[in-house]
Each structure stands twice: as C-alpha cells, then as structure tokens.
Amino acid sequence: MKTSPRRPLILKRRRLPLPVQNAPSETSEEEPKRSPAQQESNQAEASKEVAESNSCKFPAGIKIINHPTMPNTQVVAIPNNANIHSIITALTAKGKESGSSGPNKFILISCGGAPTQPPGLRPQTQTSYDAKRTEVTLETLGPKPAARDVNLPRPPGALCEQKRETCADGEAAGCTINNSLSNIQWLRKMSSDGLGSRSIKQEMEEKENCHLEQRQVKVEEPSRPSASWQNSVSERPPYSYMAMIQFAINSTERKRMTLKDIYTWIEDHFPYFKHIAKPGWKNSIRHNLSLHDMFVRETSANGKVSFWTIHPSANRYLTLDQVFKPLDPGSPQLPEHLESQQKRPNPELRRNMTIKTELPLGARRKMKPLLPRVSSYLVPIQFPVNQSLVLQPSVKVPLPLAASLMSSELARHSKRVRIAPKVLLAEEGIAPLSSAGPGKEEKLLFGEGFSPLLPVQTIKEEEIQPGEEMPHLARPIKVESPPLEEWPSPAPSFKEESSHSWEDSSQSPTPRPKKSYSGLRSPTRCVSEMLVIQHRERRERSRSRRKQHLLPPCVDEPELLFSEGPSTSRWAAELPFPADSSDPASQLSYSQEVGGPFKTPIKETLPISSTPSKSVLPRTPESWRLTPPAKVGGLDFSPVQTSQGASDPLPDPLGLMDLSTTPLQSAPPLESPQRLLSSEPLDLISVPFGNSSPSDIDVPKPGSPEPQVSGLAANRSLTEGLVLDTMNDSLSKILLDISFPGLDEDPLGPDNINWSQFIPELQ
C-alpha cells in the first residue's frame, strides 16, 4: 500500500538532529584553527561570566561564557553532578535582572570527566517568563532534548539514566570538556542566522515530541500486547473498522470514548494506520460510527464533549485481548504471537480465496460456449417418420389435406430445411390436378392398353416404405407438362434428355449409356430391384442432412419436357419450334401452389450438357406421323384448352392412335433392345394426350374404360408421390439420381418378354 506523503516528513523531522553526532569531532578539528586573539577574548569574557555566575548564586563548577557569534547569548557549561533545576532557576533570574540589554539566551552544555549525554541532538526551546522574553536554550549532546528537562520536571535519576545510555563514540571523539574555556570554541562554526532559525524550528519540534512522549508513557502498558504489530507495520490488520471501534470502546472502563481517543487507540494498537495507511481511514471510522446503529453518541453534562458508546443490547464486549486469546488453555501463548499469527496468514488466505473464487468463474465463462454442444437436441439426427402418418393420407385423406399434413410434419421434424411437397406421378395414366394450368402428369410406358395392370402396380407401390424408392415396376418421374402447343418444343426436350444423362453418369456407380423402361418385370427381378433400391435409400439416409446442394432460383429454371428416347434430339430437330403461348413463370408458380405453401425451386432441373450421352439411332420421322391429332377418338384429353390456331400448324410426330389400339399395333416390331429404346418416344410422349381432365375421370365417356382406371390409379399415385417427396429433404433428388445396376446385362431384356400373355387381358 502506498505510504502517506506526509508521514516520511514527520520521521525526518524526528531524525533531523541525528547527523549532528559528529559535531564534537568536527569541533575538535576546528579548534586548532582558532586564532590566539579570539581565544584570549573568549577567556576574558568567560572570566567575567564566572564572576557573574558567582554573584547570581550558581552552583560551583558552572562556567558561563558569551557566544562568539550570537548576540545576547551565553554558553553555560554544567558539570555532571550539578542540579539542573537550580541552574535553570538561576539563569532565569539572571535574564530578568539583565533585561533587554543583558543576555537572555543561554546554551547549556555538559562538561566533566565523561560525556554526560551522547552527541547528536541540539534541540532548543524557548520559554516565556515575563512580558520580556527570556529564552533559555539548552544544548546537549544526548538524544533526549534539554527542553524536556525544562518543561517536564524529572528527578535527577531519570537524567542520569539517560546519561548512562550514551554511545561510546562520544568518548572516542574526545568530547570531554576541560576546565579551560578554550574547549568550547567549536561553537564558532554556527552562524547566527542558521542557529536562530534552527532553534525556533527545533523548539516547536521539541514541544511536539514532549507531548508524544507523554502520550506514549500513558499508553505504554496497554500497548504491550500489540508489540508484534511493530514487526508487521506494512500489513493491514484483519479487522473491520466496526470491530476496531468496538475494541477501542470496550478497552475503557466506562465503555465510552471520544472520536479522537478512538483514532489514538487504533493508531497505537495498529501501527499500520499510523505510518502507512492513507489519512482517509479516519473518514471510514466516522462513517462506520454513523452508519451502524450499535454505536450511540452521547454528550457530556455541559454539552461540550461527545462520547461514542455501544448500545447495551448490541454490545458483545469484544476486546483485542479476547481476539488473541489462546485456543488451548494449556499452552501459555503470548497475545502478540497469536496476533501476528492471526494477522499474517489472513491476507494470504484472502488472496487464495479470491483466486479460488475467480478461477471457477473464469472457467465457467470459458465453458459457456460449450454448453449448447452438450445438448443432444441440437445434434442433427434422422427422425424416423411414423409409417401410419405417412401412408394414411395416401389412402384415406384427400390431396389438399394430405399436402397440409405433410407440410406440417416436415416443418415439425426438420426445421432447418423446408422443401415444398411436390406431387410425384407414377408411370400410370392420370388426370392433371386442375384444368386451369399444366400440372405434373404421369406417363404410360407402353400405352393405355396396359391400364388393367395398373391397380396391381399401385398396390405394390403402397407396400413400399415411404422413405424408399419405388421399383422400376412403377417408377415415379416428375415432369412439368407444358400446354399442348408447347409440347413438341425441341430445346426443352433436349435439355431434359441431357440433364437426365448427366444425372445418370454422376450418380450411378456404373455408367450406363442406355435407359430402358420396361413396365413388366418378372417377380424375382422386382424383388431384387427393391432390395437394391432399399440399400441405396439407407445409404442416402446415413449421409448428413447438411450436405445440400444449392439450386438456382426457380425463375431461372426452364420448362422441362419429358422425353428420354435416344431419337428425341433428331426427332425434335426436324420439328419447328412453336411460339410459347404460356408464361413459364406462371407454370412454375402454379406448380408451387400445387405442391405446398413453400416457394422452393424444382429439384429435377440439373446442369445441362450440350452433348447427349445416348447414341442417336437412325429412324425416319415419318413413322411417328401416322395420324393427325383430329383422329383422337372424339375425346379431348388436353389438360389446357388452347386456341385452335396454335394447335393446327403442329404436325403429328407422336403417332397418336385410337384408344382401342394397343402399343403392339402402333409400335414397330421389337427385334432388339435398341429398337425398344428407340420406340420410347412413341410410348412416353403419347401420354399427355391420353391424360384426361377431372371431369373425364368422374364421368367417363362410353367406350373408354381405360382412362377411368388409370385416373383412379393416378389419384393414389399422386398422394403416394407426395408422401415420398415430403419424407426427406434429399429424397426428391434420390428419385431422379437413383441408379439401376445390372439393367443392361439382364438376360430378361425387353425382347425376351413374352407379350402374348398380356394380349388376352388387353383385349
């Protein structure tokens, strides 16, 4: 702690006379330098003073000489056995007799065979006796000032005791004064100005020292228990101000004390507050006295003095001796030892406690960021969706309600990524959701003639787990269907084909240059494909949900036309690109409204490639133009009512047949898988014209039972596709990216299928 700025000055003032200890030796060195004339004059003056001293009834052996430099000042040499009080009385009387003209200052020095007092201090004091001041300056060589002897009547035994405590260096310096007056010539080195100013200052200091010594004499005995505090002045006592005030008040007999006495008691018992503490500790004492109710202020009878007492109900009569009382009564331990033991470790304990309390707090501050990591609910895990909740809407709940249920289920299980439920359309003939705009449609792989088999396939789809892929028997394919006049657009179909080929090459473990869609599989092949799909679906589930690929905004996505046949590019190149009669943005917004409330991009659009990965087989476009659109059996299966002017100039590249015809009649003979692949555009692209509107599903026209059956299957597959898409945020990508290894090398290819077993059912 910082020391008080004024305290070192007080200490210096007390030690100020100490450097004068070498004064006798210095004077002895200077004595030979004195001129003989000065010595003779001093001797003459001294002889006069001796005569005066005899007349003033001075005791024998006292020599008085005038000061060589200071006017009206005399030096009095006192023997060891002289009575100081009688000498002072005689000097006072002499000063009164001489008045202002005579000497009124006397410097007393001790003389004899041995130094009466150690060298060091030359304090001077001045005392007033009358209207005329007679200053008696007593100069000694001991640490005890002569002013104390003037102001405090002490017995000669005390003075002798002080004289016996002199240091031996005075003797070595030869400070013994002979009877010859020449031995006091060392006083010449003092100038009158310096000696006068020093005498005035030292007189004031000696008064202060006198009062301090009187106070120390009074409190010398009670301060004995706290003697050990002298060894630890730099350490603050381990007591509060309130406790120290109680110690001070309870130390008195009447249990009351003035504020000044409280200050004094604390300074005496705890030197820290006297030497080191800042002066503000007294303000703290006053603050505690007025703050605590246990301290009561009382006034004396005359109302001039106020005392502080402790309220009887709150007084525990704590004293400093009780605090330092030994714990073991059998061990007589001094209070000061206990005091030092109790005082010294406490600051260390306090520091240790602060360290112990601060370190856990710092550790807790560091651990705060780690706390959320421990919480298990923040770890991304795969939430298993209840199968009943997923499958029930596909069978019992209407489509809008199913969409709302799935969106709420998705929002509840995956809060980070929200993907709008999209309608997945299986490879069956269905009707669009509404006739107002193009929706997501389904396609027949081999024409409407296979519609009697579709209910069985739909049942198989419902048996599949909701998070799994559907097998090739009824693979759902998302297709954004444009209006009728936009259907033969060459560029979107080219993009669709290239995008699918990019998916196949990037996602499938084995590259497959061909895609063969066969709606009929043997039971063993269906089971094996289901196992493969389940295995891939589990592997996709095991991936982190954070691995999501950002898609471009939906505005930038082109309209997709479904055509995966290898001859589509050549077929589309021969067709003129018609004017687009519908806004792609409206179609996208419509598809988002159908899917759900979230505006998310369509996920089946992928980066396109300018080079198709499938070989284009030579095929004449004339085989596709078999019948014009006017021959479609009188049934309007167009999802959008378009103007006739937009649909008239379109040629018929799709080979639309009557509904009563079968794919075997319209398609060329299947000699090889290549021929089957090249005939895919016939089967797949003819589906949009075979899709019926909701009115056609509810009230089918006579002579066309197939659209009704396919429409029922489409309703079921629509909801099924919704369930599959809302299961996981990555399933919609799996539906397009899933690969089918072993498809090309299957011995049971499309050309090995016996189509005759299906002919009776189709008829």
From Swiss-Prot:
One of its GO terms (biological process) is regulation of cell population proliferation. The modification Phosphothreonine is found at T611, T620, T627, T662. Pfam families: Forkhead. Phosphorylated in M (mitotic) phase. Phosphorylation by the checkpoint kinase CHEK2 in response to DNA damage increases the FOXM1 protein stability probably stimulating the transcription of genes involved in DNA repair. Phosphorylated by CDK1 in late S and G2 phases, creating docking sites for the POLO box domains of PLK1. Subsequently, PLK1 binds and phosphorylates FOXM1, leading to activation of transcriptional activity and subsequent enhanced expression of key mitotic regulators. Phosphorylated by GSK3B leading to ubiquitination and proteasomal degradation. It is found in: Nucleus. Changing S730A: Prevents phosphorylation by PLK1 and impairs transcription activity. Residues 235-327 bind DNA. This is Forkhead box protein M1. It comes from Homo sapiens (Human).
